[in-house]
């Protein structure tokens, strides 16, 4: 029960930081634009939902490894990631280009 509470707390922290990025920062949503941001070395952090297809996930992780960018696996599905972004559609992956006022890049355990 304590572990469930801790994960809920951490989701709230990630969601609030993500909302701040959506307000004050720059980001790209979607698979193709995430790959573009990785190839052009603009992305600082990548978030991938839990139900992102394995082939897409591995391709994003490969490009992120080449670009030396951190990848965070969001523990919820793409509907919840879209809701956390304040969107009314599903988001399987997103790239944070400029975090703005948020400290999400320092706070999330990415592979940096």
Swiss-Prot record:
Keywords: Ribonucleoprotein, Ribosomal protein. It comes from the Eukaryota. InterPro entries: Ribosomal_eL30-like, Ribosomal_eL30-like_sf, Ribosomal_eL30_CS, Ribosomal_eL8/eL30/eS12/Gad45. One of its GO terms (cellular component) is nucleus. SUPFAM superfamilies: L30e-like (SSF55315). Pfam families: Ribosomal_L7Ae (PF01248). Belongs to the eukaryotic ribosomal protein eL30 family. This is Large ribosomal subunit protein eL30z. It comes from Arabidopsis thaliana.
